[in-house]
Amino acid sequence: MATVYDVPGDLLVERVAQRLKEIPEIKPPEWAPFVKTGRHKERLPEQEDWWYYRVASILRRVYIDGPVGIERLRTYYGGRKNRGHAPERFYKAGGSIIRKALQQLEAAGFIEKVPGKGRVVTPKGRSFLDKIATELKKELEEIIPELKKY
């Protein structure tokens, strides 16, 4: 059985985002169409369903890095801000988006809080991601036969 580590992250996040759309606990908040994802961004996200991709990415990140807290995720999703003539500077991503996404993943049962450490993936969340990774790996092996040795 393949794990999250065995498949490309971008393909996995895309597939997980499609599956998360079917889960009733995961839905964008009413303010989602109007927010930037952090201070370092100039514009809103262009994709209509960007929320599901961010939630899928956060779930993958908790799987890989867990236990992980909001501050570490804010740093991961942050970036450089263009400040005109002043030198560029790193800014963290917005915390509300990450916090709401984590709360929705907790409500769905995919992650849980560990007091004093952060959030970790539950067995249900690990199974969810590993099943999708296994499906994706089988599809990739048909396209790229060299992947069968892994």
From Swiss-Prot:
Gene3D superfamilies: Winged helix-like DNA-binding domain superfamily/Winged helix DNA-binding domain. SMART domains: Ribosomal_S19e (SM01413). Pfam families: Ribosomal_S19e (PF01090). InterPro entries: Ribosomal_eS19, Ribosomal_eS19_archaeal, Ribosomal_eS19_CS, WH-like_DNA-bd_sf, WH_DNA-bd_sf. The keyword Ribosomal protein applies. GO terms for molecular function: RNA binding; structural constituent of ribosome. GO terms for cellular component: cytosolic small ribosomal subunit. It comes from the Archaea. May be involved in maturation of the 30S ribosomal subunit. HAMAP family: Ribosomal_eS19. This is Small ribosomal subunit protein eS19. It comes from Pyrococcus horikoshii (strain ATCC 700860 / DSM 12428 / JCM 9974 / NBRC 100139 / OT-3). The gene is rps19e.
